[in-house]
Structures are given as C-alpha cells and as structure tokens.
Amino acid sequence: MVSSFSVPMPVKRIFDTFPLQTYAAQTDKDEAVALEIQRRSYTFTERGGGSSELTVEGTYKLGVYNVFLEANTGAALATDPWCLFVQLALCQKNGLVLPTHSQEQTPSHTCNHEMLVLSRLSNPDEALPILVEGYKKRIIRSTVAISEIMRSRILDDAEQLMYYTLLDTVLYDCWITQIIFCASDAQFMELYSCQKLSGSIVTPLDVENSLLQKLSAKSLKISLTKRNKFQFRHREIVKSMQGVYHNHHNSVNQEQVLNVLFENSKQVLLGLKDMLKSDGQPTYLHLKIASYILCITNVKEPIKLKTFVENECKELVQFAQDTLKNFVQ
C-alpha cells in the first residue's frame, strides 16, 4: 500500500535525474524606484562648503509639489509660495545653500537635508509642504503645523504680522485663483504636480489619457482650495468647482471675484515697498515676500498677476533676487 506522503516513482525519477539546485538570494531592491527617488531628491549643502557630520536622525526632508531651476542663480526652488517660503526659512535657520540639481545627476551617499518632490497624497490632508525629521524617531509636521510655527516667529512685530497676514490671505487667494482659473491645465500641473500633461491626441488611448489627466488636474485643484482655509473665504468659488455643470451665472460671479482679488492684491503688492529695508539677514516677512514674487514670475503663461508684478513691481522683483542670493554659493 502506497503511503499518501510517499513521492510517486515518476516524479522521484525526474528529481533523481535533475537534482534541485540552490540559487543565491536575489536582491529585493527595485532599481527603477531608486532612480525615481533620486530624480525627485534635491540635496541642501552647508554654506561655505562645510561638511559637519550628520546622522540620519539629525536630518530633515521637505516635501514639495514640484521644483523649477531659477534662471539667474540656477537654484532649484519650490514652485509653490508656501513651499518656497519654508525652503528659504530652513536654509536661513540651518546655514544651508539651496540645491542646484537632483541626486539623479550627482547621487549623494552621505546624510544630508533634502527637498523631495512628493504627491499631495503623501499627506493625509492632501496639502504640502510637509517636513519629515529623523528616521526611526520620525516627526512629521503637516502644512498646518508648519504654518503655525512660522507665524509664531513674528508675533512680536505687529507691522510685520499685518503684512504677513495680508500676503497669506489677499495675495495667496489671488495666486490660487489665477493659477486655477487663468492658467492652462498644463501650466497648473507643471507647478503643482510632477506629472506632465500630454499635448498631442492621436489615438483613442491618447483621448482616454487626456481625460484622465484633466480629471487629475481638477482633483488637484479642488484639494488645493482646502489649504489655508481658502474654501471658507470663497465658498461660492469652491462650490462651482465641485459642481457637475458650470453655468453662465456662476462664470460671471467667478469673474467678478477674480477681479476683486486681483485689485486687492495690487494694493498689497504696491504697499510692500516700504517693508523692504533690512539690517543684516532677511526677516521672515522678507522671505515670504520673496517666495511669492519668485513663484509668480516663474509662471510661463502671461496671467494678469505675473504681468502686473513684472511691469509695476520691478523693485519687488529685484528684492526677491537679492534675497535669493543669500542662499546660493
């Protein structure tokens, strides 16, 4: 009687003829993922070429929507004003120099502070920037937490606090509406996503991809309106974006709101000229001003806000460039 645990003779003959071979362990490292991480990583360096020994627990990683290379300095800057403000503030606090290229070009094998291009979905509230400190004892600071910390540092100066608040409400709202409604989807995605929209539609697959990309852009726009309490200040705008049908009445109201925001922003920008004087290193208000100006002038399409800044606020543009030079080699 054959036991249920015995090996059938035909199978036994095969394994006797072709014995099992032990293979070496295979690495589980995904090279494609590693290269993508390097492509999205930008390393800060110490001012003056210093090289203090950093451990993994002593480093931070700043998550942003996307980056651009600034034309005059070659610095890799965040494309969003809030992200760029935190980037500049971290450089000033830690004595760092802005990155100029990704790790894809020059991989780093040492522990350094980094800026990473991330999806908004990397944060539960779908907003960036986020700041990750340490590795094993990891501390993750959300956009709201970062904003509260930065704001707390100027509470003692009423005038700076007033302008800081105006920038993060009036000018911020104008920036968001101009990028969402006045720029193309391709321009918007270039600023707030590492995905690029395809401009050519040839095959049915291209049509399908184009529709998916438009849905992705709309989803990202809606999530952006939830940052900095924008949705509470402009309920009608957000409501019209979430609706299936966008009627003429909503379009007229939206245009009126955009015009009011733009006019108010013009007054704020023109009033900043008296706040540009500095004794020594830039203040947090100066970094905030420079962040908005650099991001506005980076927009490739001629939105009204960019045109006004370049034509009527040349002093602010020069101030932003001078501020940026504090953080380049």
From Swiss-Prot:
Q: Which UniProt keywords apply?
A: Membrane, Mitochondrion, Mitochondrion outer membrane, Protein transport, Transport
Q: What is its main location?
A: mitochondrion
State the superkingdom.
Eukaryota
One Gene Ontology biological process: protein import into mitochondrial matrix
Localized where?
Answer: Mitochondrion outer membrane
Keyword check for Protein transport: yes
Task: List cellular component terms (GO).
Answer: mitochondrial outer membrane; mitochondrion; SAM complex
Query: Coiled-coil stretches, from where to where?
Result: none
- Spell out the InterPro entries in the cross-references: SAM35
Oligomer status and interactors: Component of the mitochondrial outer membrane sorting assembly machinery (SAM or TOB) complex, which at least consists of SAM35, SAM37 and SAM50.
Also noted in the record is:
Present with 1470 molecules/cell in log phase SD medium.
Describe its function: Essential component of the mitochondrial outer membrane sorting assembly machinery (SAM or TOB) complex, which is required for the sorting of proteins with complicated topology, such as beta-barrel proteins, to the mitochondrial outer membrane after import by the TOM complex.
Specify the protein name: Sorting assembly machinery 35 kDa subunit
| Gene responsible for this protein | SAM35
